[in-house]
């Protein structure tokens, strides 16, 4: 008998701006998508195409996030765990087991769960969750780029690249920036001195 398993993964722990996203995905027993692997190993075009196929074929899926304010008040690790719990809680179909990418399990899931290091390359449900979390995170960055094109969010996706750091210096900190992350915090501290 097929056990309903969910894979859970996150996207956006490292960037200086925006939410951290998590996805939970339950796939059918017969699911097969050639080329599905860790989202970081896929081109954006391939990831977007796979995301649509996953959404269409999954038994159930849900994407959730924790905001920059929650990241600041909880810290990035706890905000990531919160986003993961929200993703699992948002599933309309309850899995019997959960596989989570990494080495930590969110508290209070009330479902048997196992952390799998590099799970996004080993377990297809985690690979699928990785793709959905990453495409949701990228969509947030494209929306932010529409509102603030001078920051280049569509190119660097919020990571602390040279372009992003220079834009931060030149244009300042946005409400969506993570104030507890060192480059943003340091810039705010410098501005407070003048």
Swiss-Prot record:
Reaction(s) catalysed (UniProt annotation): Endonucleolytic cleavage to 5'-phosphomonoester
Alphabetical GO biological process terms: DNA replication, removal of RNA primer; mismatch repair
InterPro entries (alphabetical): RNase_HII (IPR022898), RNase_HII/HIII (IPR001352), RNase_HII/HIII_dom (IPR024567), RNaseH-like_sf (IPR012337), RNaseH_sf (IPR036397)
Domain RNase H type-2: start-end pairs: 3-193
UniProtKB keywords: Cytoplasm, Endonuclease, Hydrolase, Manganese, Metal-binding, Nuclease
Entry EC no(s): 3.1.26.4
Keyword rRNA-binding tagged: no
Source domain of life: Bacteria
Cofactor(s) the record lists: Mn(2+); Mg(2+)
CC terms in the record's Gene Ontology section: cytoplasm; ribonuclease H2 complex
Cofactor: binding details: Manganese or magnesium. Binds 1 divalent metal ion per monomer in the absence of substrate. May bind a second metal ion after substrate binding.
Location, primary (coarse class): cytoplasm
Gene3D superfamilies named among the record's database cross-references: Ribonuclease H-like superfamily/Ribonuclease H
Binding residues annotated for a divalent metal cation, in chain numbering: 9-10, 101
Molecular function in Gene Ontology: manganese ion binding; RNA binding; RNA-DNA hybrid ribonuclease activity
Coiled-coil intervals: none
Pfam families with a match to the protein in the record: RNase_HII (PF01351)
Location(s) in or outside the cell: Cytoplasm
Family listed: Belongs to the RNase HII family.
Physiological role: Endonuclease that specifically degrades the RNA of RNA-DNA hybrids.
NCBIfam families, alphabetized: PRK00015.1-3, PRK00015.1-4
UniProt-recorded name of the protein: Ribonuclease HII
Gene source species: Neisseria meningitidis serogroup B (strain ATCC BAA-335 / MC58)
Lineage of origin: Bacteria, Pseudomonadati, Pseudomonadota, Betaproteobacteria, Neisseriales
């Amino acid at each position: 008998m097929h056990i309903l398993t969910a894979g859970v993964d996150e996207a956006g722990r490292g960037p200086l701006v925006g939410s951290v996203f998590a996805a939970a995905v339950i796939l059918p027993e017969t699911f097969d998508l050639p080329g599905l692997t860790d989202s970081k190993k896929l081109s954006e075009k391939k990831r977007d195409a796979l995301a649509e196929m996953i959404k269409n074929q999954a038994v159930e899926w849900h994407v959730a996030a924790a905001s920059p304010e929650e990241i600041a008040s909880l810290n990035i690790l706890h905000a990531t765990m919160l986003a993961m719990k929200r993703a699992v809680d948002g599933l309309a179909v309850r899995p019997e087991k959960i596989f989570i990418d990494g080495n930590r399990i969110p508290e209070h899931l009330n479902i048997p769960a196992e952390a799998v290091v590099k799970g996004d390359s080993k377990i297809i449900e985690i690979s699928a969750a990785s793709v959905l979390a990453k495409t949701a995170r990228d969509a947030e960055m494209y929306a932010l780029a529409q509102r603030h094109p001078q920051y280049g969010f569509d190119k660097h996706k919020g990571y602390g690249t040279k372009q992003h750091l220079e834009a931060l210096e030149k244009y300042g900190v946005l409400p969506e920036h993570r104030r507890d992350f060192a480059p943003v915090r340091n810039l705010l501290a410098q501005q407070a001195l003048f």
